[in-house]
Amino acid sequence: MQSYTVRPAKGIRGEITVPGDKSISHRSIMLGSIARGETTVRGFLRGEDNIATLNAFRAMGVVIDDDGETLRIAGKGLRGLAEPTDVLDCGNSGTSMRLLTGLLAPQRFYSVLSGDQYLRRRPMRRVVEPLSRMGACIHGREGGEKAPLAIVGRDLKGISYTSSVASAQVKSALMLAGLYAEGETRVTEPHLSRDHSERMFRHFGADIENGPAGVVVRGGRELEGRDIIVPGDISSAAFFMVAALIVPGSELLIRGVGVNPTRTGIIDILTAMGGSLELLDQREVSGEPVADILVRSSRLKGIEIAGEVVPRAIDEFPVICVAAAVAEGRTVVREARELRVKETDRIAAMATNLRAVGVTVTESEDGMDIEGAEQIAAGTVESFGDHRIAMSMLIAGLTAGGDITVTDTECIGTSFPTFFPLLEKVAAR
């Protein structure tokens, strides 16, 4: 089990580019594989989660060439996938498993999805139940709640579904099934979740309507291959945003970051805390808004975080907790129960780790209260096998009173394979 020790930094300075967006990378493989003709993808994130998706489609007969810079996907059309001869291994990727469940449910073959020990603990009924209402035949442990999932492909019918949680994975699974279903598939949510699927469906020519009331997909229309440029992942950029804010004497430019408004909760939260973040050269690339982000060290203050901003920053909460740990006053997080069913229980994991380095934290059922500390203490903490927990605590170490060691850091490769080189590049010692 690999551990990593980070020393306090004297500044976070320079200019970086973070790897491609994980969510968009997943979807580019999926839609490119079931489109007609060739799809090219530049900026694809070669993290373990996305490679799991890529390998799944290769196992279903899709030819995907990778020269290290550009992926070329020879699309099979809606009905061109082949039955896999073995279990499709999703690794640690909840996105791969949940979206593939929606895509595989209407295929005319049998398939099985599994993953690592962490993924096999995560809840899957949230996609199995609505897909079953569409006519899908899906079997899993604990009544469809846990993987492995065995899927017997069937013809599906569109439904109107109101999700109890704002989850892009649930929504996207139903949208993918809806491409094949008879009639309309309509999905509404309590708050708008990230809309990468809607944007990419439109880019590939799907019959789709979306707005504040939800999304409607009409089945049967073939998709056409497209050229895609994947922007930098704001969830990866978030670690370096927080680093530059909390380490005195910092100024960092992060180039080419996706700033989709359904993902910019992290910017809104850090700005509300008093952070200096400036969006430069705003433009649109492959249907997604992109900008360069200039971050300067700032004195942060505690705030209350709840409501519609929560799903727009759901993946960034571990590192938001680090910002809160060094902010003046108390930060209160509520309506974030979804954090308990991520790769690990992120509320419990961050509470445990922050307490281990001297921060006062009180858990609630759907969030936490964090009392800002004058300085984070040195110590040893756990990743809990969760890439975002590991990276967040390494960022905490940049402003601690001594070294922080994080155990089991191999998991960082699932989403951010270049994290360590970038950290060493910008951290002044």
Swiss-Prot record:
It comes from the Bacteria. GO terms for biological process: amino acid biosynthetic process; aromatic amino acid family biosynthetic process; chorismate biosynthetic process. The keyword Transit peptide does not apply. It is found in: Cytoplasm. Coiled coil: none annotated. Its main location: cytoplasm. Monomer. Pfam families: EPSP_synthase (PF00275). Catalyzes the transfer of the enolpyruvyl moiety of phosphoenolpyruvate (PEP) to the 5-hydroxyl of shikimate-3-phosphate (S3P) to produce enolpyruvyl shikimate-3-phosphate and inorganic phosphate. Pathway: Metabolic intermediate biosynthesis; chorismate biosynthesis; chorismate from D-erythrose 4-phosphate and phosphoenolpyruvate: step 6/7. Disulfide bonds: none annotated. The active site is at D315 (proton acceptor). The keyword Cytoplasm applies. Belongs to the EPSP synthase family. Its EC number is 2.5.1.19. This is 3-phosphoshikimate 1-carboxyvinyltransferase. Keywords: Amino-acid biosynthesis, Aromatic amino acid biosynthesis, Cytoplasm, Transferase. 3-phosphoshikimate binds at K22, S23, R27, S167, Q169, D315, K342. It catalyses: 3-phosphoshikimate + phosphoenolpyruvate = 5-O-(1-carboxyvinyl)-3-phosphoshikimate + phosphate. Phosphoenolpyruvate binds at K22, G94, R122, Q169, R346, R388.
